Amino acid sequence: MDKLLLGRYIPGDSWVHRLDPRTKLIASFYYIGIVFLANNWQTYLMMFVATLFMIWLSGIKIGFFLKGVRPLIWLILFTVVLQVLFVRGGTVYWHWGWLWITEFGLINGAFIFVRFVLIIFMSTLLTLSTQPLSLADAVESLLKPLRVIRVPVTELALVLQIALRFVPTLMDQTTKIMNAQRARGVDFGEGNIFQQMKAVVPLLIPLFVSSFTTADELATAMEARGYQGGDDRTKYRILRYHRRDWVAAGGMLVLTGLLLLLRA
């Protein structure tokens, strides 16, 4: 559970850290969108190099990004296997019944794997280089136009902020409960998949109790401090775009142009 990086922030003063959170949020979603435009080895290689360059600019060790892949590795491998066995085309390397391993299947599987890794790396970069509070402020700022149709933007941003803030806390609490149960002789890795799922069930009740207790304490603390929601709240930090944000936007456009040129 402690491998999950969602909601964790690594302090720093890198070029990526100093970008406006709105720029990072928009760039991340834009990047995830253009990843699906890649359709050959040249485009995927270019996207991979661009991603490594952004990681280098952030000053965050690559090990953190590899940790972000680990919790999803089985989902990635399952998707890759489906592509390999069910996509047909090109040279047939193996065939048994309705299962095939073909040239196109292997290529598709490799592309799916790289695509997953790139998306996870970019999502991890956004999380590790942006404080949850700044990310919530960015969402609130970008959703401001929805206030015209009476969407509670401030409340939605608060919910996002609390969720991002307490995901690491919840994961740490889960790890503590698992360690306590291991000390009592519980082996979460023993037996088949159904036995392992059964072993996880005793975690749920103390985890739910801990979550509700934390939520109640947070609500009490907010009431004690006189918190009032609404659009009339002021902010200490005002978001402003700087030259580096426009440079980042230009870089994404250049990346898109190169991607379109290299597409098969």
Curated annotation (Swiss-Prot):
The chain crosses the membrane at residues 24-44, 45-65, 72-92, 106-126. Its main location: membrane. The keyword Ribonucleoprotein does not apply. InterPro entries: ABC/ECF_trnsptr_transmembrane, ECF_transporter_component, EcfT. Forms a stable energy-coupling factor (ECF) transporter complex probably composed of 2 membrane-embedded substrate-binding proteins (S component), 2 ATP-binding proteins (A component) and 2 transmembrane proteins (T component). This complex interacts with a number of substrate-specific components, including FolT and ThiT for 5-formyltetrahydrofolate and thiamine respectively. May be able to interact with more than 1 S component at a time. The keyword Ribonucleoprotein does not apply. This is Energy-coupling factor transporter transmembrane protein EcfT. GO terms for cellular component: plasma membrane. PANTHER family: SLL0384 PROTEIN. Belongs to the energy-coupling factor EcfT family. It comes from Lacticaseibacillus paracasei (strain ATCC 334 / BCRC 17002 / CCUG 31169 / CIP 107868 / KCTC 3260 / NRRL B-441) (Lactobacillus paracasei). It is a multi-pass membrane protein. Keywords: Cell membrane, Membrane, Transmembrane, Transmembrane helix, Transport. It is found in: Cell membrane. The gene is ecfT. One of its GO terms (molecular function) is transmembrane transporter activity. Part of a common energy-coupling factor (ECF) ABC-transporter complex. Unlike classic ABC transporters this ECF transporter provides the energy necessary to transport a number of different substrates including 5-formyltetrahydrofolate and thiamine. Expression of the complex plus FolT or ThiT in Lactococcus lactis subsp. cremoris (strain NZ9000) allows 5-formyltetrahydrofolate or thiamine uptake respectively; 5-formyltetrahydrofolate or thiamine are not taken up in the absence of FolT/ThiT or the EcfA1A2T complex. Deenergized L.lactis subsp. Pfam families: CbiQ (PF02361).
